[in-house]
Amino acid sequence: MNKNKPFIVVIVGPTASGKTELSIELAKRINGEIISGDSMQVYKHMNIGTAKVTPEEMDGIPHHLIGILNPDDTFSAYEFKRLAEDLITDITNRGKVPIIAGGTGLYIQSLIYNYELEDETVTPAQLSVVKQKLSALEHLDNQQLHEYLAQFDEASAKNIHPNNRQRVLRAIEYYFKTKKLLSNRKKVQQFTENYDTLLIGIEMSRKTLYSRINKRVDIMLDHGLFREVQQLVEQGYESCQSMQAIGYKELIPVINGQMIYEDAVNDLKQHSRQYAKRQMTWFKNKMSVHWLDKENMSLQMMLDEITTQIK
């Protein structure tokens, strides 16, 4: 361990790999507190679809950056990095170990490496104007929205598929906030780490992972995911960027009478599997991870391996 830098444990892996359980049990062992590294769990009222940890599952372990924003608020890697850095300082100063657990690769990467991310913070009045401008675009379909983006940021439009409404909206929002083009934004990575980091990943065969994902979607639906999405739509959040998350965007057409339920569920499972594949590609290609094979290691074996690495 490098005594000159704060020590943190980071647990990554694809959706449904078991990060929540491992992080909680590890926190019990090493006197830790957990910081969520998930871009969607920051939102209130989006509990089932984001697989948000329940109070019962927390089992007394403090969790941070969960349910802190409304669904119509925006959140970025910059804001995550700023909040997480403050939390790491606070947790460390109290003699505990920060454990960051999540699957949003850019968030994790921006935290542990020296990424220079642009501050998109705006005043409440400015944010209100941005939201009004975005609301004025709600009536546009995906192709029309994509064409709107291309009018002022052709480079971003070329790199974003028209059907990826969330990314298109993100590029438009960035322009509204900063008066700059997202395609021109520079993200600088220094080759030094901010922390003494133990980076742990959970992996398993694709067959096993996909089976776990399909099963988890069924459990989410049994626990009321459809009703959760209905309530968010009824509260006026349908057009928010947060509602483009997997688990929400697939069910909105059912609520609006544009798709049958069974087809939406199949889409939800497929999108979740595709997302998991992208997550694994990101972590394997962009980060140096110590991988633990969930199929051949029990929870206790994984915990023993991690604590051995710490010592």
UniProtKB/Swiss-Prot annotation:
Protein name stated in the entry: tRNA dimethylallyltransferase
Give a single Pfam family match: IPPT
- One example of a Gene Ontology biological process annotation: tRNA modification
Swiss-Prot/TrEMBL keywords: ATP-binding, Magnesium, Nucleotide-binding, Transferase, tRNA processing
Name what cofactor the protein needs. Mg(2+)
Q: Which residues bind ATP?
A: G13, P14, T15, A16, S17, G18, K19, T20
Q: What class of enzyme is it?
A: transferase
Quaternary structure and interacting proteins, as annotated: Monomer.
Belongs to which family?
Belongs to the IPP transferase family.
Q: Site positions for Interaction with substrate tRNA, renumbered to this chain?
A: T104
- Mind telling me which SUPFAM superfamilies this protein's record contains? P-loop containing nucleoside triphosphate hydrolases
Q: Does the keyword Membrane apply?
A: no
Region (Interaction with substrate tRNA) residue ranges read 38-41, 166-170
Does the keyword Phosphoprotein belong to this entry?
no
Its UniProt entry gives the catalysed reaction(s) as: adenosine(37) in tRNA + dimethylallyl diphosphate = N(6)-dimethylallyladenosine(37) in tRNA + diphosphate
